[in-house]
Amino acid sequence: MILNMTINYIKKDRYKVLNLVLITISIIALSTAYIAEYIFHYTPCPLCVYERFPYLMLIKISLTALIIRQLNKYTLILILITILSSCILSTYHSFVERGIVQPSAICSSMIRIPQGLSIQHIKQMFYSQPITSCTKPAIKILGISMTEYNLLLNICLLIFLGLILFYPKSNK
């Protein structure tokens, strides 16, 4: 009975459910990344940091759609592009971690050296900043890196988006 009521609600207001699910999953994904970084002290590589941006975009898009109470085809296309770009970035990062492709210049250090510093200051700057390689995952759970979990999550989001868009609407 509860499941039937839930399914009827989803059929009736599928776009509100889509936005709420996207916001919730994005917050959970970002929270997981920040907990790993700031509580467990795993330093993210540059690609790991870039993989957070699509979730921030999904939160902004979904909140905007909820506030204006309108979800048109352009909003759905923007959500689709955001999730697809996250899939592409996660796939590339996974390939870099597994050695299938070479890391690009994006994977270089995020440390910027100001002009006019002495060698001692530059050494001190490098040794005080943790540098993480894009080729070595910081965490692996069951042999799968966080990047690959991110890819799986984004594939699930694509499937969910497809179900919301193409599942027959209720006539009630």
UniProtKB/Swiss-Prot annotation:
The chain crosses the membrane at residues 20-40, 48-68, 76-96, 146-166. One of its GO terms (biological process) is protein folding. It comes from the Bacteria. Keywords: Cell membrane, Membrane, Transmembrane, Transmembrane helix. It comes from Rickettsia prowazekii (strain Madrid E). This is Uncharacterized protein RP370. GO terms for molecular function: protein-disulfide reductase activity. It is found in: Cell membrane. GO terms for cellular component: plasma membrane. It is a multi-pass membrane protein. Pfam families: DsbB (PF02600). InterPro entries: DiS_bond_form_DsbB/BdbC, DsbB, DsbB-like_sf, Uncharacterised_DsbB.
